[in-house]
Amino acid sequence: MSNKMNEESWNRLSVFYQEFTRISLNNFHYNPYGPGDKELGIIGDVKGLDVLDVGCGCGQNSIVLSKWGAKSVTAIDQSESQLDYAKRLAKREKQDIRILKCDMEDMSILPDASFDLVVSSHAMNYASNIEKVFMECSRVLRYGGRIIICMAHPIWIVLGEALEKGNLNSIANYFDTKRERWDWERRSGEKIATFESTPWRLSQIVNALCNAGFVIKRLEEPRGYSEEEMRKIPADAIPYADAMWRNEEFIKANQIVPYSLIVAAVKQKEAY
């Protein structure tokens, strides 16, 4: 099962990922080298809300929402290594977060209508069935509850890596949505772990949300910061960045096409 492979790969990658990535504990992150929610203002006031973070990784966004005054925060992920780190981080930051091992395509351990807000940052492309994920998100949300998802922008999947590598011959086929297998590598080219992800088309994302009873309220396609802009911003004010080096090729490509697609929607009806 590809989801099992992703779980095992994140268990292998976790220590390296946390060592070589700088992720804010004070601003909700979306885009590498780009603005967070303090700048974009998508999430809004979370005071008094029960929040679910789907694919929480090491829990940085969960910790941020807890600090911002959420009534409760539940964080789920498949990777035990990531969750162990999340528990240590939450304890260090003195935040009371419920952290659970859970598959986002089957959240049956969570009761119906138990959350006001579901958030997810760059987890949805790992799903093998995005309709199942959105159906589950709808099930656990109360009526009028919101979902805010950030995922790989379909335009980036088609063009981004080609621009990053300076090789337009490697432009991907937008209509090919077969699962992709790829390696996470060190800068030296040494493979650390192998993952599978799905290059969801925009229509698949939108239709899956609509079929799950959501009404889309807002779309954002944030441009990442340029090198010039980053020179004027304190390093710790960038919510997500590489810790040891700066990926200049990615930064340049993200000035041309968006890396992330952010969708905010409201649950207003039963799933179809």
Language-model segments: residues:
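Short alpha-helix
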Residues: 196-219
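A short glycine-rich, Lys/Arg-flanked "PGG" loop and its adjoining helix->strand segment in the class I
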Residues: 131-146
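Conserved class I S-adenosyl-L-methionine
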Residues: 1-47, 60-64, 89, 146-184, 223, ...
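Class I SAM-dependent methyltransferase SAM/SAH-binding core
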Residues: 52-54, 58-106
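Acceptor-substrate binding/catalytic loop of class I
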Residues: 155-158, 190-203
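A short SAM/SAH-binding and catalytic strip from SAM-dependent methyltransferases
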Residues: 116-130
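A short acidic, Gly/Pro-enriched loop at the edge of an enzyme's catalytic core
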Residues: 108-117
